[in-house]
């Protein structure tokens, strides 16, 4: 299976269209008011309607309550819930059972020891997203444009398909993919001219770079122990 490319934090129809036309596999919508990429439900529903059938839709939340999650499920109908907070494994399992969406759990990395945080989620999530650990004074857990040491993931077996995130952009993607063999890559700030404002040319450049850097086949879910599929039926 080819590398999955996800453009996250989209908030305008024009840049969403740029991502879709350039061949993005997934698009992410952020539901977290402290983020400059936050979208309200009405805008999210509009964007999701444009993307549906052309790319998978991920709804990014941070320790969201049931009211918000219910509204997202009803109005946006995402394919994925992308959880970037401190959601414990039992909460992730409950969300996976409650909503008609697969679950991607973000895990922040700073050292190789942080990989131990993945194990409790292997049986309750469908995919892991590795991001850089946010600074202590950060107001949001991701989208900060900060990479982590990709060598942390060299030879790692997280037990689930995983997405590489954190500080990626068109100019460093080939270096990252030379060290790590992810199921997919995720970018947000790396395709922005200013914080929270996506740039269509940068989106296209990132997707081109991802395709060029991933010319060899990617692992398929279930192909090996490191990529065991744990997806909700249906």
From Swiss-Prot:
Highest rank taxon of the organism: Bacteria
Protein name: N-(5'-phosphoribosyl)anthranilate isomerase
Keyword Cytoplasm: no
Enzyme Commission number(s) from the entry: 5.3.1.24
Gene Ontology BP terms: L-tryptophan biosynthetic process
Family: Belongs to the TrpF family.
CDD domains: PRAI
Keywords: Amino-acid biosynthesis, Aromatic amino acid biosynthesis, Isomerase, Tryptophan biosynthesis
Organism: Afipia carboxidovorans (strain ATCC 49405 / DSM 1227 / KCTC 32145 / OM5)
PANTHER family: N-(5'-PHOSPHORIBOSYL)ANTHRANILATE ISOMERASE
Gene Ontology molecular function: phosphoribosylanthranilate isomerase activity
Gene3D superfamilies: Aldolase class I (3.20.20.70)
Annotated catalysed reactions: N-(5-phospho-beta-D-ribosyl)anthranilate = 1-(2-carboxyphenylamino)-1-deoxy-D-ribulose 5-phosphate
Pathway named in the protein's UniProt entry: Amino-acid biosynthesis; L-tryptophan biosynthesis; L-tryptophan from chorismate: step 3/5
Segments for region (Disordered): 211-234
EC class (word): isomerase
């Amino acid at each position: 299976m080819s590398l999955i490319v996800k453009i996250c934090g989209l908030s305008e129809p024009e840049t969403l269209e740029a991502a879709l036309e350039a061949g993005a596999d997934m698009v992410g919508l952020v539901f977290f008011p402290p983020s400059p990429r936050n979208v309200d439900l009405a805008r999210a529903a509009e964007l999701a309607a444009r993307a549906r059938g052309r790319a998978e839709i991920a709804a990014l939340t941070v320790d969201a309550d049931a009211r918000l999650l219910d509204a997202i499920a009803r109005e946006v109908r995402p394919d994925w819930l992308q959880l970037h907070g401190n959601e414990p494994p039992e909460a992730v399992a409950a969300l996976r059972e409650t909503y008609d969406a697969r679950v991607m759990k973000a895990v922040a990395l700073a050292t190789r020891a942080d990989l131990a945080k993945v194990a409790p989620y292997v049986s309750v999530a469908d995919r892991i997203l590795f991001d850089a650990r946010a600074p202590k004074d950060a107001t949001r857990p991701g989208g900060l444009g900060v990479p982590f040491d990709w060598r942390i993931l060299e030879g790692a077996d997280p037990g689930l398909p995983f997405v590489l995130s954190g500080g990626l952009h068109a100019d460093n993607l080939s270096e990252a993919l030379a060290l790590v063999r992810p199921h997919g890559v995720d970018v947000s700030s790396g395709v922005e001219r200013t914080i929270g404002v996506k740039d269509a040319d940068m989106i296209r450049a990132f997707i081109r770079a991802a395709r060029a850097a991933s010319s060899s086949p990617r692992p398929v879910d279930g192909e090996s122990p490191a990529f065991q599929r744990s997806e909700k039926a249906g």
